[in-house]
Amino acid sequence: IGFYLRLQRKYLIVLNKLMKKIAIIGGGISGLYFANILNHQKNFEYKIFEKKDNYNFLEGYGIQLSVNSIKLLNQIEFNKFQNDKKFNPDKINFHSIKSSEKICDLNISDFNTKDCKYTTLKRSDLVNFLKKDLESLIKTNYNISNIDHKNQKIKLTFENKENAECDHLIISDGIFSK
């Protein structure tokens, strides 16, 4: 048994050297999507650093997802998402902002496939779907203040005085990026 424990310890040391550390800055849709993709990879260790201190989203904030985005989301089992929380419209109507008259419509169902359909849903429902298996990897209240790159390592410093080191950095902090 001692031999196997030493062998296992050596294996873990080698594996740890080979395992790449990834820091994902931003716990929104793109950061969470990327983290879900990494969940299927065994040679990456990662954490998600979100500057907000919580995930409180307004329930009524809706988003639209194109067929192409649904194709990507289906890679992380979005096709198993609750049907009663999403809607697949057939067309979009365009109206004049001045007169409210209809200008035209677009039959978006023409772009649908059997597995990928134009979809609308609440942003909060999509975020909850994306973060459901990642809760322990999300660090909230981590606003980045400095990025330093030395000796093929990236050192992150946060406003809360915490530090993190990684091999790769994914910055997906949205439209309010610094």
Predicted features by range, described:
Residues 19-28:
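Beta1/beta-strand and adjacent pyrophosphate-binding region of the FAD-binding site
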Residues 22, 37-39, 66-178:
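Conserved N-terminal helical subregion
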Residues 28, 52, 173:
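Proline-glycine-enriched beta-turn/loop adjacent to the NAD(P) cofactor-binding site
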Residues 31-32:
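N-terminal Rossmann-fold NAD(P) dinucleotide-binding loop
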Residues 39-59:
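Glycine-rich FAD pyrophosphate-binding loop
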Residues 54-72:
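Conserved N-terminal glycine-rich FAD pyrophosphate-binding loop of Rossmann-like flavoproteins
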